[in-house]
Curated annotation (Swiss-Prot):
Residues reported in the UniProt entry to bind ATP: G30, A31, N32, G33, Q34, G35, K36, T37
Name of encoding gene: recF
Tree of life domain: Bacteria
Keyword Secreted found: no
Entry keyword Transmembrane: no
Alphabetically ordered keywords of this record: ATP-binding, Cytoplasm, DNA damage, DNA repair, DNA replication, DNA-binding, Nucleotide-binding, SOS response
InterPro entries, alphabetized: DNA-binding_RecF (IPR001238), DNA-binding_RecF_CS (IPR018078), P-loop_NTPase (IPR027417), RecF/RecN/SMC_N (IPR003395), RecF_2 (IPR042174)
UniProt name for this protein: DNA replication and repair protein RecF
Gene3D superfamilies: P-loop containing nucleotide triphosphate hydrolases, RecF/RecN/SMC, N-terminal domain
Record's subcellular location: Cytoplasm
A UniProt-annotated Pfam family: SMC_N
Family the entry assigns: Belongs to the RecF family.
Length: 372
């Protein structure tokens, strides 16, 4: 899908906004704190994956207002599409596509997909395992809402099991109760793990190919999945292996009041020329790997959905050196991908790039089209 126009009501610092967009590159320029990222966030929400800033819906409602509403008009497969997302009031949160209410907010990803690239993504390599798990989970959830459902159910059962572990330590629960939660957790853990590994097997070739191009065939990367428990070669034995791992660490889990084995403890390992990129990669190499992962995300979604996602570059251009900026924009423009970029200045763009882009000045939630 490509967005032709968007309307906001009571979203963050936008009381009301209506703006038309270009089919290619759109640049939002302004000082920090004026609403550039808020506008990108509103677009990201329309793909059903939640806020890329991990914000709660109530935090996105304008101060002293009761609701927010986002409406986008665009085209998909040559047909007009209208997406609406609202939060607040009696129904709390609802989503519509062409005036048809969706059963789940996550179903928005069937109509529109987005890939967000922010400065935090540049630390994907050296960051925490949780950051790399989020990268993988958000990507797979957009490609398949069913994966998002499995992940949500796993998280809910995990929370309940951790609560029971605390009660076990206090003496107010029994081992039999824990077995019941293990029965629910284990199949969800194994399904989450299987879907992650299958997804990674499709993403990794793109990342390897893209990184080879960025390094001009001088270096290569490998992506591997590190499970928190030993995985048998035979997938039919994974459930048994996971239950065994839970049993072996039960005393430790009760003592620490937390589940210590499962997909929530796994990691995506990144290797550069056979060595751990987190330890041995330079900052430039780590950023190139992060860039490769995000571009691989775009290619993966295109493979699944047969169309490119909308790309949101949130204050990331100033964090890249000129070569990587040029490589990124050239890659996106060559595929006719619709791109939204936030920046505090236009120095990072060539006159030719600015001439092709839609440029919008943002100040205190007010937006105006610029001719620069």
């Amino acid at each position: 899908m490509q967005i032709q126009a968007i309307e906001l009501a009571h979203f963050r610092n936008y009381r009301g906004l209506q703006v038309d967009f270009m089919p290619g590159v759109n640049i939002f320029v302004g000082a920090n704190g004026q609403g550039k990222t808020n506008l990108l966030e509103s677009i990201a929400l329309l793909s059903g994956g939640g806020s890329h800033r991990d914000a709660r819906d109530a935090e996105m409602v304008q101060w002293q207002e009761a609701y927010y509403r986002i409406k986008a008009m665009g085209t998909a497969d040559g047909q007009p599409v209208v997406i609406e997302l609202a939060f607040g009031g009696e129904r709390r949160k609802l989503a519509k596509v062409n005036n048809r209410r969706l059963r789940r907010i996550a179903d928005l990803s069937e109509t529109m997909n987005t890939v967000v690239f922010s400065p935090e993504d540049l630390s994907l390599v050296k960051g925490s395992p949780a950051q790399r798990r989020r990268y993988l989970d958000r990507e797979l959830s957009q490609a398949s809402p069913a994966y998002g459902d499995v992940l949500s159910r796993y998280a809910r059962v995990l929370t309940q099991r951790n609560s029971l572990l605390r009660r076990l330590r206090e003496g107010s629960a029994t081992a039999a109760e824990l077995e019941l939660w293990d029965d629910q957790l284990a199949p969800l853990a194994v399904e989450t793990l299987a879907r992650r590994l299958d997804g990674l097997a499709r993403i990794a070739p793109y990342a390897r190919q893209i990184y080879r191009g960025l390094s001009r065939d001088k270096e290569q990367i490998e992506l591997t999945y590190r499970s928190s428990f030993p995985l048998p070669d035979d997938r039919s034995r994974w459930l048994e292996a996971y239950r065994k791992a839970l049993q072996e660490r039960r005393a430790e889990e009760i003592a620490r009041q937390a589940t210590l084995t499962g997909p929530h403890r796994d990691d995506l390992q990144l290797f550069l020329n056979g060595r751990d990129a987190r330890i041995y990669g330079s900052q430039g190499q780590q950023r190139s790997i992060a860039l490769s992962l995000k571009l691989a995300e775009i290619a993966f979604i295109h493979q699944i959905k047969k169309e490119y996602p909308i790309v949101l570059l949130d204050d990331v251009m100033s964090e890249l050196d000129p070569d990587r900026r040029q490589q990124l924009l050239s890659e996106l423009e060559s595929k006719n991908i619709q791109v939204f970029i936030t920046t505090t200045h236009l120095h990072a763009f060539s006159p030719e790039q600015l001439g092709r882009a839609g440029i919008y000045r943002i100040q205190a939630g007010q937006l105006s089209r610029s001719n620069e």
